[in-house]
């Protein structure tokens, strides 16, 4: 077997060892996984979902073009004859799209070059930033000077920006000054989801929701966005060094958002695979992505991700800081952590998770817990506090952290280091003590015009979930809440995307602004590409269910379009309206693979004779034809019953036999 080494240039056009023998196992080898990821990104091009097209809704200026996906629908057959059928068109359905250029068939993304700098002019025209002559971080300087890393480095590194002396460049600062930024206008258009384009009365129908105090205007304006940001109820993660990102907002008075976690570890994954996961995540609806890398080449991996990400990127800086001290938590210090913040801020990280609420006096509160401290960042800081017997440097230097964030517009995601790791530990003293401290830190961050959101649990049974939301709103001053699930039971490893999706839907309804996805691999291993998709689909369902329950304007349009297509047996439209068209189509075709199955007025669940919707259609048609009010449904049902008996007692009919019968 060849001993030719793996191509060491990540993402290079040169393929990985062409002579490498494929693995004979059912599970791909590490080499095969990396090769597959490289092929994916080397052949990457803008791709739309089936029967969808990319549209751009324009704003008040030429450089505001908000991407949407528009799902094209087939017409409804009204009647007529075989030779002269009568159809009624169905209007296309616009939907929120996070995929950036990767979802535009006209785009030709090149990961080696990175995405276009959408926000560069907006940032420049505010005249409050300056390009640095070099990087500020000592660690970054060391990496740049290491020629041995040239083969890993993103080639087109931009010069970092920073606020001019005496200036603050955060969206919160602008909002408080009464300024409506292009980012805010972009967001207002995006949040409305093009629903003003929908004319059909059937599609616009919606049940009233229960918003639990959320304010959901019928039309979201740029001024409303500004007001919500100024009040601290919403954030726009938008580092000035990540101009490639498309503006989005996180707040309970907006659509519920979903975050996807990616990142390498000490034992698995490569730069290629993480870039692939990024693109994959945005395709399946990730509103933000957190890079939680803990393995080798964290700095270089993050650069590739940022330069190719159309969504905000978050990190947990303490993870990288710990790598710099070889995993010894006691050796962490403020100087090293500060340097890590500068490193990541100048790369373009949009929000930092900071576990500044883990105080020394709170650690003993966890002693009687069933599962102790399960947050990685929380356990690191707890160990540091106990080792030094003092408050953490994150807490002691929090104002300095805010100064750094204000200079780059990095939002703070105040981490819940003492979140419960089992339902038994939910809502305990330690959890809420930390939450109250996070509320105090929120006010400090706001003094520096730094945007803030609050992280939440975790593992919480259903009956205890709402208290988490009410406590956060009260003690954290309505700052956006961002939760991991919560998981509602602990008995389902391998299915924790389900157990947590239940809790996510509930807390999203109660007011949580962003849900951090959980994949099937939670508690078991690092997720792969398919796990990422499963987690995202589950959480997009949870977020959408929460929007419906809150009564978010226009949230029901897609549901109504799906129901109409289902009732009219427009199978292709049903597939295309689904969150996951590929899976919907595949499941249908398992039992009805013929093309005739795509037009049949039944599916394999009930067959043609017991399809409730087909029966209902026939009853409706009969009532209309009779033009009588003499209980048409009962009469129709009786006649349908007689017709079914006359056709025989078979439960299932083939698609071909049904079509033959209908053509008579």
Swiss-Prot record:
Cellular component, GO annotation: cytosol
Coiled-coil stretches: none
Region Disordered: start-end pairs: 1-37
Catalytic activity: 5-amino-1-(5-phospho-beta-D-ribosyl)imidazole + S-adenosyl-L-methionine = 4-amino-2-methyl-5-(phosphooxymethyl)pyrimidine + CO + 5'-deoxyadenosine + formate + L-methionine + 3 H(+)
Cofactor binding summary note: Binds 1 [4Fe-4S] cluster per subunit. The cluster is coordinated with 3 cysteines and an exchangeable S-adenosyl-L-methionine.
Disulfide cysteine pairs (residue numbers): none
Annotated substrate binding sites: 261, 290, 319, 355, 375-377, 416-419, 455, 482
Keyword set includes Zinc: yes
Molecular-function annotations in GO: 4 iron, 4 sulfur cluster binding; carbon-carbon lyase activity; zinc ion binding
Binding annotation for Zn(2+): 459, 523
Protein role: Catalyzes the synthesis of the hydroxymethylpyrimidine phosphate (HMP-P) moiety of thiamine from aminoimidazole ribotide (AIR) in a radical S-adenosyl-L-methionine (SAM)-dependent reaction.
Homology family: Belongs to the ThiC family.
Name by which UniProt lists this protein: Phosphomethylpyrimidine synthase
Annotated organism of origin: Pectobacterium atrosepticum (strain SCRI 1043 / ATCC BAA-672) (Erwinia carotovora subsp. atroseptica)
């Amino acid at each position: 077997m060849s001993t030719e080494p793996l191509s060491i240039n990540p993402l290079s056009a040169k393929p990985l060892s062409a002579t490498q023998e494929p693995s004979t196992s059912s599970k791909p080898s590490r080499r095969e996984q990396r090769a597959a990821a490289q092929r994916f990104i080397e052949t990457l091009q803008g791709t739309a979902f089936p029967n969808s097209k990319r549209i751009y809704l324009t704003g008040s200026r030429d450089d505001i073009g908000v991407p949407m996906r528009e799902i094209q629908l087939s017409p409804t057959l009204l009647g007529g004859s075989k030779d002269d059928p009568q159809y009624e068109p169905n209007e296309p359905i616009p939907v929120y799209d996070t995929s950036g250029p990767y979802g535009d068939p006209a785009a030709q993304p090149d990961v080696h070059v990175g995405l276009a700098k959408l926000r560069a002019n907006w940032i420049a025209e505010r005249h409050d930033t300056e390009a640095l002559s070099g990087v500020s971080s000592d660690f970054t300087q060391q990496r740049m000077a290491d020629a041995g890393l040239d083969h890993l480095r993103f080639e087109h590194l931009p010069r970092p920006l920073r606020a001019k002396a005496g200036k603050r460049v955060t969206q919160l600062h602008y909002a408080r000054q009464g300024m409506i930024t292009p980012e805010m206008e972009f967001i207002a258009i995006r949040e409305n989801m093009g629903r003003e384009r929908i004319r059909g009365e059937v599609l616009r129908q919606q049940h009233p929701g229960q918003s639990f105090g959320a304010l959901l205007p019928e039309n979201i304006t740029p001024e409303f966005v500004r007001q919500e940001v100024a009040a601290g109820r919403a954030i726009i993660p938008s580092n000035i060094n990540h101009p490639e990102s498309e503006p989005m907002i996180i707040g309970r008075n907006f659509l519920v958002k979903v975050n996807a976690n990616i990142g390498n570890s000490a034992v698995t994954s490569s730069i290629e695979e993480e870039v692939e996961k990024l693109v994959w995540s945005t395709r399946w609806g990730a509103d933000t992505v957190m890079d939680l890398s803990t393995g080798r080449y964290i700095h270089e991996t993050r650069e590739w991700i940022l330069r190719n990400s159309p969504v905000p990127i978050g990190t947990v800086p303490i993870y990288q800081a710990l790598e710099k001290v070889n995993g010894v938590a006691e050796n962490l210090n403020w100087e090293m952590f500060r340097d890590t913040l500068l490193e990541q801020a100048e790369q373009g990280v949009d929000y930092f998770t900071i576990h500044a609420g883990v105080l020394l006096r709170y650690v003993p509160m966890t002693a009687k817990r069933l599962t102790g401290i399960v947050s990685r960042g929380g356990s690191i800081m707890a160990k540091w506090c106990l080792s030094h017997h003092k408050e953490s440097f994150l807490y002691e230097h929090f104002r300095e952290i805010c100064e750094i964030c204000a200079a780059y517009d990095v939002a703070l995601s105040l981490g819940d280091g003492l979140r419960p790791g089992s339902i038994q530990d939910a809502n305990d003293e330690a959890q809420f003590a930390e939450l109250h401290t996070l509320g105090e830190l929120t006010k400090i961050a706001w003094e520096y015009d730094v945007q803030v959101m609050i992280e939440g649990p975790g593992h919480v049974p259903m009956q205890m979930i709402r208290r988490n939301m009410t406590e956060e709103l009260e003690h954290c001053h309505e700052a956006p809440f961002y939760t991991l699930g919560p998981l509602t039971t602990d008995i389902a490893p391998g299915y924790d995307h389900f157990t947590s999706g239940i809790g996510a839907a509930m807390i999203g309804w109660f007011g949580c602004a962003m849900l951090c996805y959980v994949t099937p691999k939670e508690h078991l291993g690092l997720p792969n590409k398919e796990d990422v998709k499963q987690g995202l689909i589950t959480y997009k369902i949870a977020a959408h269910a929460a929007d419906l329950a809150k009564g978010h304007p226009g949230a029901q349009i897609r549901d109504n379009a799906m129901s109409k297509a289902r009732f009219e047996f427009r199978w292709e439209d049903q597939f295309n309206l689904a969150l996951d068209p590929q899976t919907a189509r595949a499941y249908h075709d398992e039992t009805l693979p013929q093309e005739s199955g795509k037009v049949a007025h039944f599916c394999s669940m009930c067959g043609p004779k017991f399809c409730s919707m087909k029966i209902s259609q026939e009853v409706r048609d009969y009532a209309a034809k009779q033009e009588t009010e003499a209980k048409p449904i009962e009469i129709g049902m009786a006649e349908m019953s007689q017709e079914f008996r006359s056709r025989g007692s078979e439960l299932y009919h083939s698609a071909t036999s049904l079509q033959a019968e209908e053509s008579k």
